[in-house]
Every structure is written in structure tokens, then in C-alpha cells.
UniProtKB/Swiss-Prot annotation:
GO BP terms in the entry: axon ensheathment; negative regulation of cytoskeleton organization
Name under which the protein is recorded: IQCJ-SCHIP1 readthrough transcript protein
Biased composition (Basic and acidic residues): 182-195, 225-234, 381-395
Keyword terms, alphabetized: Cell projection, Coiled coil, Cytoplasm
Biased composition (Low complexity): 76-87, 108-141, 198-212
Acidic residues bias spans: 167-181, 416-426
One Pfam family cited in the UniProt record for this chain: SCHIP-1_C
GO molecular function: ankyrin binding; calmodulin binding; transmembrane transporter binding
Annotated function: May play a role in action potential conduction in myelinated cells through the organization of molecular complexes at nodes of Ranvier and axon initial segments. May also play a role in axon outgrowth and guidance.
Organism in which the protein naturally occurs: Mus musculus (Mouse)
Domain of life: Eukaryota
Amino acid sequence: MRLEELKRLQNPLEQVDDGKYLLENHQLAMDVENNIENYPLSLQPLESKVKIIQRAWREYLQRQDPLEKRSPSPPSVSSDKLSSSVSMNTFSDSSTPDYREDGMDLGSDAGSSSSSRASSQSNSTKVTPCSECKSSSSPGGSLDLVSALEDYEEPFPVYQKKVIDEWAPEEDGEEEEEEDDRGYRDDGCPAREPGDVSARIGSSGSGSRSAATTMPSPMPNGNLHPHDPQDLRHNGNVVVAGRPNASRVPRRPIQKTQPPGSRRGGRNRASGGLCLQPPDGGTRVPEEPPAPPMDWEALEKHLAGLQFREQEVRNQGQARTNSTSAQKNERESIRQKLALGSFFDDGPGIYTSCSKSGKPSLSARLQSGMNLQICFVNDSGSDKDSDADDSKTETSLDTPLSPMSKQSSSYSDRDTTEEESESLDDMDFLTRQKKLQAEAKMALAMAKPMAKMQVEVEKQNRKKSPVADLLPHMPHISECLMKRSLKPTDLRDMTIGQLQVIVNDLHSQIESLNEELVQLLLIRDELHTEQDAMLVDIEDLTRHAESQQKHMAEKMPAK
């Protein structure tokens, strides 16, 4: 009889192993239809609980084998025991298939076979896993099952704490919605509908059956209370609402509060087990509107637009600063050009408003005079050699001598020393050279004062400013304007119109003076070029005269 019953139970076991994934896929499909997210990993605590019950039941059966050999029981009772042990073909047609059973419903098949013997002990609450446990093995068999369950239940509180720490903070809201759809109350207990049979186990040896008989799970301290009528628990193996006879209840996601110690499956840390809700028990939290979804793309676009605007504002500010600095640099460059291009060092201020310190020093200009023999048309060289002729005036000018003038003066001194030893025929050339040098020195000495006098004459001939006609009571204004200096007291006595006229007149004078300055600079460059050419010619003539003098000096002793 033992082998036949095992063969009969083998087919439901295979169906459970193969149908586990079918049930999971069916549950996922139903959840998708009802817009409920389900995480298969959240079922691990209950699955582990079912596995612990299965192992305990198998060990209990192994312990009952020697007892059955000592006191054999009728075939019908043994058949009822094994048929009531595990029921693997119990499936739910409701919207929420029960994963937590893992194919186990203690006493589901035995309920129909032993319903005729439910007259003697209908109100019994003892832990009786099957009908034969009481009749064949005495109360010690029930204690053996309890001890086996204690062995397998000891590590579960540790696993329970770990699962609570990992899953309770993350899946608080989602698990609450899911549990509420499956019929859970606010305290974590599954609700029972009218007509629902949640826990069925076998009665005593007379065949009596209790409709509300359950198997208690261990308390947090590990002790069992099998005779506690208030502790309606089934070792975590609870069948929730949704049997074939029950109508399908539509589900809706409801957010509800859950104690911090509770976890998935309705287990409470205070009680340590699963409880069943009476038909009229349980209150529901009113439905709350879900939080609006975040539009991340629009948010990113908005942030990018803000960054782009900020960058544009920075670029505009930088462009303004650059334009302001460029204007300042342009004005400064114009002033430097005007200062470097001043015609007279100590002339009047009508040609330039800068000091004469901006002009390059004379030694720096004379330093590039050696390049004149290579290219005397160079403007930079000609500008720096403007005062080369002044070096020849040793008596009236304080400027240092240029290299070329030093050479010419050294040649003249050497000629004067050799003049005594030369013949009278050579005196004509040397005398002529000295005479030309003296005339050049006199002309250079008179050039600077004559230039100053010419500038004064041009200043007197310059037309008066039209401001003098507008301000007859202030005749000194025109003179102050010519000198580029106005007193604050004079400006306070003027009206806005008069000040605007003065400003316009100053702008017009600046433009005219700039044009005149450009013309004078061009003339100066031409004169510098001519001067450089004349200096080169003088240098060549001096060398030629020296060579001729040496040649004639060599011929004289030969004669």
C-alpha cells in the first residue's frame, strides 16, 4: 500500500514542479491587466516557509514508519493519512493565485474523505496533521511533528529579520497595494470571504473534522502553543480568498500603512505568524491619488536652456568689457602714435597733447644709423637718424655725435695734423673740406631756431575759434581753447548750449589737427630719407678723399 500511494502522489508532485512557472506567468499576466507591478523575489520568504513545512512533514513521516510496522493500521486509514498529507493539485481561479502554498494544502483532499466521520470531535483544536496520527501513534506522534517543526523553525527568525531589513523599506508601498488586493487587512492579516475555506486538516481517529482548526507557528521565543484557540495560524501556509466557488473580486491599488515590523505575507514581528481576518473584519484606507510622474526630458531641456541663457549673458558681458578695453587701447595707441610722431620735441601743444618723453631717445635713433649703408630708404632707420646732422655742430648743440659724424670729425682732425707735413698743392682740398664742414655746422645751428620761428608765425596766422564770436563777454575763452585749458569757473558760467558748441568746436579742431599731423609726418619722413642719402654720400666722398690723399702721399716720397 505504501508504494501505491507514493506512485499516486508522484503525479501531483510533477504537476507542481512543472506548473510553478505556469502559475507565475498567469499571475504576471493578471497583474499587467490590472496595472499592478509584481516582484517574484518578494515571494521568497513564504516559499522558504513552505519548504520548511515540507521537510518537517517528510521527517515526521519517516519517524512514523517504525510505529506503523509495530501497530499496522487498516488500509483505508493509511490511505487517508497520505492523501491528507500533501495536496499538489489545488489551484485558484481567482485573480490572485496563491504562491505561498507552493502546492501544499494540508488536509484538502482528506476533507472530503473524512467528512462522514466529523461527529465525535468537531470542536477540537489540537494539532492533528492527519487522521491516523491520533489513532495509530498516540499523543507522542503529534509531539514528534511539533519537535520536527521546532527544528526547522529555529533559523527562520534570523531569515525573517534579514528579509525585513532588505525588502520592507523598498517595497513598502507596492507590497501594501498587492497585499490589499489579495485581501489583507491593515494589521497584516489576510482577509477571508464568506464561504472561503482557508485551512483544512484532518480530525482525530473517529474521523471528526473541525472547520477552524489550524496549526500554530512558533512564537518569537521558539515555543509552541498548540492549544491556544486565539492563535489562528497555519505555519505560514495560508490559503487566501479565491477558491473556485468564490467570485472574482476586482483589484485596485490602494496605499495603506503597515507597521515597521511587518513584512510580505502578513507576518507581524509581535505575533510571529499569519492570522486570518473574519468575514466582517478589517478597514481600508481611503484611496489616495498617485503622485504625478516626473517629465525628466522636459526638466533636462529646461536646465539646458537656463545654462545657455546664462552663458549668453556672460558672453555679452565679456564682449562689452572687451569692446570697452579695445576702445581704450585704440585711444592709447593713437596717443602713442601722436607722441612718437611729434615734429618738434619742445614745440607747442597744438601738434600733440602728450609729453615729449614718449619720443624715442636720440641715442636709440642713432644706434640704427649703421644700417643706412645697406638700405637708406628704411623708414624706421630714417626716423631714428633725424638728428644725425645736429651731431656735427660741436659748439652750439649738446647732442652726442653720430658714428658717421664722429668718423668725419676724426678724419678732419687727422687731416689737420697731417696738414703741416703735406705739400702746398694738397692744401686746396683740405681747405675746401674744412670750409664745407664749417658751413654745414652753421646751417644746422640755425635750423632749429628758424623752425621755431616758422611755427610761431603759423600759429599767429591760424584762424580764431568760432567760440569767441559766441562768447563776446569772455574774450579769454578763445585763448584758453587754443591752449587746451579751461577753468571750472568759466564752465560754470556757461549754458548747456554754449558748452555743446565748445565740444563740437574741439572735435572739429581735433580732426583738422590730425590731418595736418599726418601731412607733416609724411614730409618729415621724406626729409629724413633725403638726409640719410646725403649722409651716405658724404661718407663715401670722405673715404674717397682719404684714399686719394694716401695715394698722393705715397707718390710724393717716390719723386
